[in-house]
Amino acid sequence: MALLLSQPHFSGPLLLLVVSNLLLWEKAASNLPCVAEEGGCWNPLLETFNSATQKAETLHNLADQLYVELYYNQFSSGQFWDFSSQIIRQDKTVVRAGSYCHSSLTNPPNTGVHINIEIASYLKTLINFVGSWISPLFHLVIELSATKDVPETILSKAKEIEENNRQILSDLRWILTKVSPAAEMTEEFPHWEYLSFLKSSDKNNKFLAMFNLSYCIDHDSKYILLQLRLLKCLITGKDC
């Protein structure tokens, strides 16, 4: 069973072959434990996937809106359009900020070949991917809250993005404990290289960090949503 896992800021296809005895998974999916309730059966695992997917959809919509607003709101539009001009002129510092995302360090290798991976390992990879955004988004909210003349629309979106990402991570951690109770998880969240830029008193550095963050979370939110949908299909057999 070949699944295409491609992240927007990577080039080339990544094919992931899940070989953790899918026939057993499919059989288990049809017999998932549920809690009997009046009017039907409530499946905690399925409901958690539904909740996480809804949060991921919200995360993606907000990230997309924030990315656009930072380009067109007077608060940041001047700096963002200047950065775009510098990318055209091939300024290496700005090109990197507008194309490289620290979260890529948590991705499966982009080799273009079939990779054997167990469901638990797949979940762990996604946990580290989502977790890589905990610190950057937390500090973005702190810095925006302390910055003069920040529009409420930008600050509120940043807060909602941070909250949704944090809740998705919590859902994924819970799902892992139910899917693979014996699995040992070592969370390794990569360092965001623009954190010092974000905390800088230099206005250009601060906005360059926001330029990188807004680009990457916009792209990564699409990836998170895709992976949640694929995992939901593999583990629960629903919405495939």
Curated annotation (Swiss-Prot):
Record-linked Pfam families: Hormone_1
Annotated CDD domains: prolactin_like
Keyword set includes Translocase: no
Protein's cellular compartments: Secreted
Main location class: secreted
Glycosylation sites: 212
Keyword Oxidoreductase in record: no
Tissue-specific expression: Expressed specifically in the spongiotrophoblast and trophoblast giant cells from the junctional zone of the chorioallantoic placenta.
Signal peptide (residue range): 1-30
Keywords: Disulfide bond, Glycoprotein, Hormone, Secreted, Signal
Domain of life: Eukaryota
One GO MF term: signaling receptor binding
Name of the molecule in the record: Prolactin-8A6
Gene name of the record: Prl8a6
